[in-house]
Amino acid sequence: MELANICNATIAKGIAVQKDSYGGYGVYIVDPGALVGCNDPKLGGDKIELLRVSSVFNVKNLMEAMNALEGEYAEDGQRAADMFKSIIGSSIEELSAVSETCLLVYFMMVIYLMGEQGYAVPMKISRYIDTVLLGTTVNNASNCIESMLIHYEHVALFHELDNNLQKLHKTLISKMPSKKNYSIELLRQIYSATVSRVLEIPQELHEENYMDNYVVTPSLVPILDYVNHGDKTSRNAYYDVDRRKGDIILYLDLTVVNPGKLKPNTEVLITYKDIEDSLAMITKYGFDPANYTTTGTKIFSCTFDKMYLSTNKFDNEIDIRNFYQWFSINPSLQFVLNSENEWLINDSLAEFERLLVPFATSSQRNEHYWIYSDGDDARKRFMEYFDIDEVEDEDEAWAQLETQFKWFESSENDLMPFPPCVWTVKSKFLKEKEATGYELEKVIQNKLENSRALYNETTNQFQAYLENYLDYRIDVLQEYSPEDTENENAVSQLIARELSVLLKIRDRINNNKSIFLNSEDKKYAKLPLLPTKNVERPPWLSEGDDDFDQD
């Protein structure tokens, strides 16, 4: 294929890129017989080279390729190299906080637009953009972000994605030499194609000690980026780096497959990670593989609807949304698919125990219960905490502080940049009659860890609250009609996945089955959490000010 020639890729006989079952493309073994006997004893005899790629695109080598134009195209090359340096150099400050993958998207956009404006750009990069990044339709979250924010407004991940897209677009418009209003749809296309294809490639820092000195770099690897992801039971290949040449190589793994027994058109599949994150898959690729049982781990995370948490108070008194804000508790649940193909709540996470804290209220109301107070008691505690009891105008200092924390309470931000002085607890666990702040949370957490009776009572109260939430959320999801998001696959896939998981959890509750993983396997305590939402800026910060401190 033309792209292989342009990008210096070598493809083994019997291998081809073809349409896959999800509407995209994959790499297939169309003629297994062509691979029989191709294993090289010098490589250990347990693998066959299917693909070798010399041209890899990442931030570093895109910069190098554009700088190299100075010596390749005389004046045109110098002009293009200077323009690229100018655009990127002036963009660094605006893009200092974005990920390296976002920078890769930005570099690709700049190179593409420079080519459109008549600047000399490297042919292989230009062809890759035209053929792959612009020629691949990926119905992932970035291509339907408006609909995703309508249906999942409460999920911080999609606000973060939207903010990244807006930041890249705004920077692009302001830095390109032609002040055209470049379409954000073009950016979304390149963004969606890039994030769905990017691979984490290890890069050597010091040749003499490679294993201890390398970084993982988000990279686009032509042809290899057509290879799809499989679980541990279907994976039959893996990629590696040729340390001597720097090439990326795709190997057929002969420890798991025998090419002589493969059927024609067997798909080549690699495993990216041991953790299969349904939400991440839908966000990046626009689809979620079916349930399966593997030696890996499949998870699904969802964020509570914060309006529900605020309007449906626990015990008719505790505003769960407000409580989670003040204690900076991530308002998300993580579900794990166990070996019996059942979705269960991951209660091994430290953050899950923090979710339980507001529910650690005795039903008898005589042992311990939470109290919210933003009046004189809160004022006293704030003044003591900030040591501002000797200011000239204490009333004015308190008024300013109260205005600020009230603004945060009503904002969409999940984290509060103040100590939780408005929340106190009356408890027989404490020597004092009343305590407050993060120390208070630690006391309750310690009691939860060391009192099985209290833990059971707390989880029961949490489950009762969750059961009502499930009824509410399932009703919302079941009102969804696919026509609402026609051709926006990521939205419909995410709704279907969340609905499926929540229905299974509710069924377990109705059948008096445990909904908790209750595993002693330490790997479950380290699974990744969803990000928290912190996108609104306080009105007392001007546009040029640094973001407020959330620590």
UniProtKB/Swiss-Prot annotation:
User: What is the first-listed, main subcellular location in coarse terms?
Assistant: cytoplasm
Give me the reactions it catalyses. Answer: L-lysyl-[cytochrome c] + S-adenosyl-L-methionine = N(6)-methyl-L-lysyl-[cytochrome c] + S-adenosyl-L-homocysteine + H(+)
**SUPFAM superfamilies (UniProt xref):** SET domain (SSF82199)
| GO cellular component terms given for this protein | cytosol
Cystines in this chain: none
In the UniProt record, does the keyword Cytoplasm occur?
Answer: yes
A GO BP term here is: methylation
Ranges for the region named SET-like are 184-288
In its UniProt record, a GO molecular function of this protein is: [cytochrome c]-lysine N-methyltransferase activity
- InterPro entries, sorted: Ctm1, SET_dom, SET_dom_sf
- Subcellular localization, as worded in the UniProt entry: Cytoplasm, Cytosol
Q: Which domain of life is it from?
A: Eukaryota
Catalytic activity, EC: 2.1.1.59
Q: Which PROSITE patterns match?
A: SAM_MT59, SET
Family membership noted in the UniProt record: Belongs to the class V-like SAM-binding methyltransferase superfamily.
* Domain remark in the UniProt entry: The SET-like region, although related with the SET domain is not detected by any prediction method.
What this protein is called in its record is: Cytochrome c lysine N-methyltransferase 1
